Amino acid sequence: MNTYSEDFSDQAKCKQIALNQIDQGASVVFQVAGGCGLGALDAAKEKGVWGIGVDADQSFLGPHILTSATKGVDTAVFDTIKSIQDGTFKGGKDDVFGLAQHGVGLGKISPKVPKSEVDAVMKVRDDIIAGKVGQIPTIVK
């Protein structure tokens, strides 16, 4: 299920969207909605289902957080500034900062997740970094 809040600040709106999805059978809430998404994570806590944080590690929100999809904006900014300083910056092109470049990643994984499952996730992550996984989709359909 996916629903667009069309809002990045109204936590009550995102909470209601998440509650509706949970009522329809969702057992994990993965929000990508800025501050609005905090309401969705609150709904996950309230209903006793997993929540997945976004942008930074949101495990501090409680034991209902499975993990977080993190963005390494700091890495992208640092690398870009460094390339400007050392004269290697080439404007006019897109640079992709994936797992290998620390542009994306996972926050802390809940200690409630069995080690075998964490190991399986880490293996896939390592395989992606090593180029052993084919084309990764970049568009939600």
What are the roles of these predicted feature ranges?
Residues 1-141:
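A residue-level marker of the well-folded mature domains of exported/periplasmic proteins
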